[in-house]
Amino acid sequence: LLALERYADATGDTAFLHRPEVEEGVAEILGRLAEKRHPAVALYETFLQPTDDERVYPYLTYDNVLVWRGLRAVARFYSAHTGQAAEAEAVRAAIRTHCVKTDADGAPYFAWSVDLQGHSDVYDEPPGSLQLLPLWGFCDAEDPVYQNTVRQIRAPDYAYSFAGSPIAEIGCPHAPWPWVLSLCNSLLCGHAE
């Protein structure tokens, strides 16, 4: 969905979006998403994290931001799916309600994943980093929740932070060293030193 949006925005070719095979693909994606939606909360479950490693809790903030963005794109380009705009806003609200936690000092941050029973984790993966949320248009780079999130995952005491190293980036268990994808994220987000 995001690739279709980028293609249409870059080329102005919206006719492509209405080819039968593309519309069928969009319908298939929406059907699969519907299977992963929580019955009462507009969050979508995932089994794997961006690295293809198994997740801890079922509702990943980053993945739900992608769902939010994808649903907005569908509503924008497909008149038969304009109702997805309301679902996108429900996802946005659910992320802000359920995926924002507070640290020991009371500062709000985006959790990596949550389970809706109060559990969450502080974590990040360069292939789908929380640092990218402003690039997806989900929040402003000056958003205090975003700023606190970035500060947490780049802090020297975060297990996969390499702050103070020659390449002061983020890793994860999948790649337990400063990952080049993290460097790319930092360049995109203005965090590179």
Residue ranges and their predicted role:
Residues 51-55:
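Contiguous mid-protein beta-loop-alpha structural module that forms a pocket-lining wall or clamp
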